[in-house]
Amino acid sequence: MENQNRRARYLGVDLGGTKLMVGEMDAGGTLLRFQKYPSGLLTQRAALELIERALDDFLDGGRPDAAAAAIGVGLVGRIDSRTGTWLEIDAKREDALPVARILSERYGLPCFLDNDVRSATRAEMLFGRGRNSKDMIYINVGTGIAAGFVVDGRLVCGGHYNAGEVGHSASGIPFQTPCECGRPDCVEAVASGLGIDRCARLLAGRYPGTRLTIPDGGGRVSVAEVFAHYGDDQLCRELTDNAAQAIANLIMNLVRFSDPDTIVLGGGVMSDGFLYPKVLERLNQHTIRYVTNGIVLTDLDPRYIGLLGACSNAVKGKESAS
């Protein structure tokens, strides 16, 4: 059985806001092949149809080979990972779909799903910085901000599968930045990709000589450009420092919550490493003294961590079902 597990292949589907990625991973965490497909702002049912078309294409007519052991899916929104139900894509669009059952019946394989951040947390547990930890927090700082909590080796999902929405905790940066949730000054409203864009627009009037490009017509401020002008633009410096302080405050609060020995930072805002030392220098060393494995950047490729996470759902789901 162990040799069979080593030879097993796991299919993964990672649905993001702008792209869909389908891939195949071996039991050691190596992506064997993958394919990108266009996505967009979809309803859940339209997204499921897109997933089915992409899988049919990837599998050359929808026929998994004999080595395929399971399908794993990572989705945005709220997921009942126990039953494999996609409960909602966001708080304003709820349409519970039994995605795991539908895909399992279509492709003849067991299917397991979770939201995107908990999926990435599983990838960290299996193949990343969390391999040697039973008490870990993975914090994703990207378009939004959320976290996966591992406590005594178990990933926390919550009573309503909504655990980890830490982006909607207070940032400690009090200048009344509006957040999508309706509260001001959430961490996500200050330090996420969307939050940095919103803050740049709110603060730009104070800095008429800024070098930062503020796009019109639905474009978003480039976080990379904000960081690039940190040394020569006051607006960019304020945006960066506020984001770093908000993330540091979040880390120090979460440390008190679940007592982790490891904290892993990932997501697009953290991916180039520029913000990381600025976060570290704002941490109170006494507060983080028990984080003995450190506060570290993910060592998984940020381009593929979502797909690795989806495949990891398949690995862990198959293990639990055995």
Model-identified regions with their sequence ranges:
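Glycine/small-residue-rich loop that forms an oxyanion/phosphate-binding "nest" at active or ligand-binding sites
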Residues: R118
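Residue-level detector of high-confidence beta-strand sites
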Residues: F34-K36, I89, G158
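ATP-binding/phosphotransfer module of carbohydrate and carboxylate kinases, centering on a glycine-rich
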Residues: M1-A70, I79-T83, R101-L109, L126-S133, ...
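A short acidic/small-residue loop/turn micro-motif
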Residues: P38-G40, E94, N162-E165
